[in-house]
């Protein structure tokens, strides 16, 4: 990498805490090298207490873009100059672009785009579909927003009645006001409503994190009656590659089961495009990530 650095090298970054575990530097730097782009991507350990200074640093240093992860996705919103339609609806940002190099910072959210591109790659269309999502955290609500913007018929979000539930209610209010989709939020503890929603949906998305450590032996769906051959089962967890949910769905006849690796790739590819104007070599990066897991 050192031989690629010059006085013209442009900097992109990750602002998160923790940041050191992230796959983003590996993905972006590998893509820069593959395409011969004079960019470098660094991870910075930044929480809410240092976020305003970090954003001001982006302006002062001409950093051309940054990914934003926990705990900064919502806290960064008032520090920016402009939001994309999806970010405005979600009330959260995971990508910031310094559009003119002079400090005009625009916030985007690419999680939803990543999920929908991953579905499209598997031949799954979302237009005019009824979709159930379990989990109303950042990923779940971002996906709900993009589903609404891209023409889903109904989006049924389920979550426990925590602080996240109240925040999600505001996001869904915006989806109903700004898109043609009918978006609703229900208590995940209401098993009857949850089962009925899955039965009426063509796509089930699990955005809860159940299935990854330390809950790798758990699944929200344990009744084979909920699994149909035509139900798409999409678990955002990508490690392990096959969660308890996906194994159960496959065993009981679901023909289309998907993990979150494609979403990880495509949300990163969307951020890469926003920051550089170039298309990320997705197939190359997918192979790199798969090798890294072995």
Swiss-Prot record:
Its EC number is 1.1.1.25. Keywords: Amino-acid biosynthesis, Aromatic amino acid biosynthesis, NADP, Oxidoreductase. It catalyses: shikimate + NADP(+) = 3-dehydroshikimate + NADPH + H(+). NADP(+) binds at residues 135-139, 236, 260. It comes from the Bacteria. GO terms for biological process: amino acid biosynthetic process; aromatic amino acid family biosynthetic process; chorismate biosynthetic process; shikimate metabolic process. Transmembrane segments: none annotated. Pathway: Metabolic intermediate biosynthesis; chorismate biosynthesis; chorismate from D-erythrose 4-phosphate and phosphoenolpyruvate: step 4/7. Involved in the biosynthesis of the chorismate, which leads to the biosynthesis of aromatic amino acids. Catalyzes the reversible NADPH linked reduction of 3-dehydroshikimate (DHSA) to yield shikimate (SA). This is Shikimate dehydrogenase (NADP(+)). It comes from Streptococcus equi subsp. zooepidemicus (strain MGCS10565). The lineage of its organism: Bacteria, Bacillati, Bacillota, Bacilli, Lactobacillales. The gene is aroE.
């Amino acid at each position: 990498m050192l031989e690629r650095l010059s006085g013209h090298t442009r900097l992109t970054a990750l602002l998160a805490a923790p940041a050191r575990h992230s796959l983003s530097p590996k993905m972006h730097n590998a893509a820069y090298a593959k395409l011969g782009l004079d960019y470098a991507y660094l991870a910075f350990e930044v929480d809410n207490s240092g976020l305003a200074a970090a954003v001001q640093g982006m302006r002062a240093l001409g950093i051309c873009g940054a990914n934003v992860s926990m705990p900064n996705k919502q806290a960064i919103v008032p520090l920016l100059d402009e939001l994309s339609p999806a970010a405005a609806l979600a009330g959260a940002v995971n990508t910031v672009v310094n559009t003119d190099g002079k400090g005009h910072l625009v916030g985007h959210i690419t999680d939803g785009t990543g999920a929908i591109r991953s579905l499209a790659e598997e031949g799954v269309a979302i237009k005019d579909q009824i979709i159930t999502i379990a989990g109303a955290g950042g990923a779940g609500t971002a996906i709900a927003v993009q589903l609404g913007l891209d023409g889903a018929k109904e989006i049924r979000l389920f979550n426990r009645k925590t602080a996240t539930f109240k925040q999600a209610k505001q996001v869904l209010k915006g989806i109903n006001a700004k898109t043609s989709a009918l978006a609703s939020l229900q208590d995940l503890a209401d098993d009857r409503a949850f089962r009925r929603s899955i039965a009426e949906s063509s796509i089930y998305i699990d955005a809860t994190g159940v299935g990854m450590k330390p809950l790798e032996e758990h699944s929200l769906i344990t009744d084979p009656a909920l699994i149909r051959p035509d139900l798409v089962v999409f678990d955002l967890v990508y490690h392990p590659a096959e969660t308890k949910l996906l194994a159960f769905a496959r065993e009981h006849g679901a023909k289309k089961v998907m993990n979150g690796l494609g979403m990880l790739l495509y949300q990163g590819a969307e951020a890469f495009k926003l920051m550089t104007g170039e298309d990320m070599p997705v197939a190359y990066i997918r192979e790199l990530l798969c090798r890294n897991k072995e």
